[in-house]
Amino acid sequence: MGFINGLLGNASTISTAEAKAELARILLEGENVNAAFKLVRDIIVFTDKRLILVDKQGLTGKKTEIQSIPYKSISRFSVETAGRFDLDSELKIWISGAELPAVSKQFKKDESIYDIQKALAAFCM
């Protein structure tokens, strides 16, 4: 069901071991993965030091953008839930000193956006 959810744009939880293996080349020594979510090919990872956003691009997904955001740099975030006619939810994250959100992720109508919001709140506050 996780594969189907991913295709539909729903975020699904992935194991911390899987996320750690995926990010082995960029994790610091002693840095622990606390939670991870997969959205189609993208990954949102919460470590004990930072938020890591992996954006796999292109047809094959070989080109990858990795954003590393220290929690202390996150000034605010917002969650816009899906409505009756608007089927997408949206997560926005602002970085200190920025007027526009540095991160904007779209989710299909599902409950996983609340889990991601809860993890953000736990690490940023």
Show which residues each predicted segment covers.
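Acidic, Ser/Thr- and proline-rich intrinsically disordered linker/docking segments
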Residues: 2-27, 36, 59-125
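Conserved beta-hairpin
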Residues: 37-60
